[in-house]
Amino acid sequence: MAQVSTVTSQAGAVISHDVAMRFLFVGDSMTIGRAGDFTWRYRMWQHLEATLGDGGYAITGPRTELYDTEANAPLSHAYGDASFPAPARRHLAGWGEGWLHMAPVIADAVASARADVLLVSLGLIDLGFYTDSTQTAANARAFITAARAANPRIRLVLLPVIPNIRAESDAPFAAECDRFNTLLAKAVADLDAPASPVLLASHPTGYDIHTDTYDGTHPGPTGEHKLAGAFADAMHQAWGVGGPYAGALATA
């Protein structure tokens, strides 16, 4: 299945959003962020504010914290912008958590948050520490099934794995990342449905782990913009939601 830079999940489909869309951000350390980060979630909030406006959307989820690297726990609320509204900080993301961890909890999270759109960035931690590409893809399918059990009309946008710096020196790991992305695309093609569309976002345009991350894995400000842009452009191109991402591709 081609990525949504060129096609939609259901060709030509436009998602009606007469009522406020309820977004849930799901991810690992790249999504939760660490103390002092802005996070791509913050960049997406800015985009939603600009394109859907007050009352046109809500951000949901059971967590609001950033990861505190000194405490080795998600205890921080020190976002890069202290004025980031508390309700918009909500998410379901965890440092060291992947598809393996999120598949068992997503149904309860969707039900309790009343989420209807999931923006998901998972897989790197699975492949790095927990499961091979085949099992990781199986867990992604289980995640989608569980989310639909809680909301049969749930909509999902999935980001492919972005190989980190480890892939430059670990050829088997790099191959597993590539294979998982192929399997993820197949899962999207298999599971996409009119009542519950699933999109595979494009790899963020121009994303460079040497300049868009602070350590070869986790996004800095430019990387945050590019991650948010991948999700935003997928929804706009495929569903007519919001508009093209216009966030500044520069440091905050």
Task: Kindly label every feature range from the protein language model.
Residues 23-26, 212-252:
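Histidine-centered active-site loop/cap adjacent to the catalytic His
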Residues 24, 30-138:
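Conserved SGNH/GDSL esterase-like catalytic core that processes O-acyl groups on lipids
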Residues 26-27, 159:
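Short hydrophobic segments within beta-strands
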Residues 31, 45, 49-53, 111, ...:
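Sec-exported extracytoplasmic/periplasmic mature domains
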Residues 36, 40, 102, 106, ...:
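Stable alpha-helical elements in mature extracytoplasmic
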Residues 119-128, 144-179, 202-207:
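Active-site segments of SGNH/GDSL-like serine hydrolases
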Residues 128-143, 168-180, 213-222:
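Active-site cleft segment of glycoside hydrolase catalytic domains centered on the general acid/base Glu
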Residues 163-202, 221-225:
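Substrate-gating cap/lid alpha-helix
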